[in-house]
Amino acid sequence: MTFEIVNPASLGEPRGWNNGMLAPADGRLLFIAGQVGLEPGAAEPPGFSAQFATALDRVLTVVRSAGGIPSDVGRMTVYVTDLAAYRADRVALGQAWKARFGTHYPAMALVEVKSLVDRGALVEIETTAVIGGTRP
């Protein structure tokens, strides 16, 4: 998928995301429900960075099941229950990101919420991808 990256100079240079991703006309939209990082059957929920990595894996499972690749992701909203934990784990989160997405950064938002529906969930990731468009 080849997105046209849209980063107006008046908004400053983004770090770790892009302000806009213009999809090619020949792609198909894939809307991915919020994915959490809990492991089914685990006695204890994993920590923040482990949940983030697992949530990313689940997102990519859906993308790949639709015939896509990581760079097809055009938008991502990350919901966290503890912004301080996110900030404290930024190095580990960056490593998890690069292992899965490399240097592909979609348009992103990070939102702190009081809680998530799944008990023990610290992170939930909602995503939109464009599948089947023109690729380099």
Indicate residue ranges for each PLM-predicted region.
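N-terminal presequence-like segments and the immediate start of the first folded domain
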Residues: 1-74, 80-136
